[in-house]
Amino acid sequence: MANYYTDHPEIEFHLNHPLMKRVVDLKERNYAEKDQFEDAPVNYEDAIENYKRLLDITGDVAANIIEPNSEDVDLEGPHLENGRMIYASKTFENLDATRKAGLWGLSMPRRYAGLNLPNAIFSMASEIIAAADAGFQNIWSLQSCIDTLYEFGSEEQRQKYIPRICAGETMSMDLTEPDAGSDLQRVMLKATQDEDGTWRLNGVKRFITNGDSDIHLVLARSEEGTKDGRGLSMFIYDKRDGGVTVRHIEHKLGIHGSPTCELVYKNAKAELCGNTRLGLIKYVMALMNGARLGIAAQSVGVEQEAYNEGLAYAKERAQFGEKIINFPAVYDMLSRMKAKLDAGRSLLYCCARYVDIYKALEDIARDTKLTPEERQEMKKYTRLADAFTPLAKGMNSEYANQNAYDAISIHGGSGFIMEYKCQRLFRDARIFSIYEGTTQLQVVAAIRYITNGTYLSIIKEMLENEVSDDLKALKERVAKLVELYEAAINKVKEANDQAVHDFLARRLYNMTGDIVMSLLILDDATKAPEMFQKSANVYVRMAEEEVLGHSAYIQNFKAEDLESFKA
């Protein structure tokens, strides 16, 4: 029987990473709840076994319910009835299956009926579900919006809303408007207070994923007369209170099971989450960082499924009297797909572990004073998480698109036929590098860590890691790429021209990702050569190809060259 967890032992490899011990010890606060809750682990080993059981259940549901439903969901999609969004019929089956399996409220504390799982484990479950159906993964993974309410909401709000999400109610984050896409400081949905202090929301939200959810986090303008981000606050809207209707459901290229809605707020009752004026500059940034990690996991799931589809077809398809998997042009594509998958997954879980450590320490700090060592640790991992999140989202969303493209190429003409899954993967993946911040915006988020030397210091530290003897030559090649990378950064900084900086930023970003993932996959191949040695060989060569090209481009670029590129 298929299982999307046990069929891919690479996921369990990352579950057993040495840093997971620190992650789990912090998340479980040294197992303080072992006598209070029946499902609380007594030690690290017990926690890991719990995670394996949950991921095994997730893999079973994904392979045997969600994936078999995926084609019907893609064909039917959601529809509109009297101002309400109605899911595709099989989506209701998926929701029911995940609720019965206990796959809701994963990250929330047990006192609110959650499972208290680390972000790394939630990301693994997200990857597994996305491999089965990326559209449904959107609906399911938006439960992570509750993390923002947990962090910034009141205790009364936590007790009111978190148990509902843990029971399987759905969420959405209502940020985008017709005139406020990437530029969220232009949000104009109005928040006003009645005489009794009740907040009311009026206006329109657009492109809202799962927009008719049970509980919404809404970005709205609470400060009259303001036009920038400092006038925006975060609100909680409960569908039970009414006041919001769905005006339109978008007819999209892909992720058909995930409803994308235009919402009309008419005097909708809402609750302020946190403090006024901090909606965009603090709360949405936290919300978006979580969402970006979610898209990285979604991307890795589709990278895996696209590779699976391409590999299976190449093994069975024969041309010129031979299976096409034996043709160099085909196994070149497949090896690159696998290398991107393995390196991208390593980056995803590396980032998730960093997020886990700083988030757990932040949570502990709400109840007790951190030691100086813990404060230093939180500062370190906050910096690492902030640096790695835009890399994980941007690089993996691009890799998902590339793997889906190559899966179709391997299928040839059959890949262009709707009966084959690879066409759906291609359509679904296209949005990954757009929503929750385009790849260009991930570059904007990452560039300061490039120019201030953060990535370079991380990379040089990673270069100190020992690799197995048969990988040392590859590591030396990566070390030479680091020299080119440092020279490229210096060349761009010396230009002292913002337009040049912006134009070359994407190339520096790609170089960063290529080098970081080269070092990660070398580390993985040292620990598990049977799993990752081939991918390490392929990925480092692929990175070398990319970095050398970007280096030459940057070193030969002059400010006056910009004129050739302007429309």
Regions found by a protein language model. Give the residues of each.
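Alpha-helix capping/hinge segments and adjacent helical runs
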Residues: 2-5, 10, 17-19, 255, ...
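C-terminal amphipathic alpha-helical interaction region
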Residues: 112, 453, 465-567
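Flexible glycine/proline-rich, aromatic-decorated loop/lid segments
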Residues: 191, 255-285, 413-439, 482
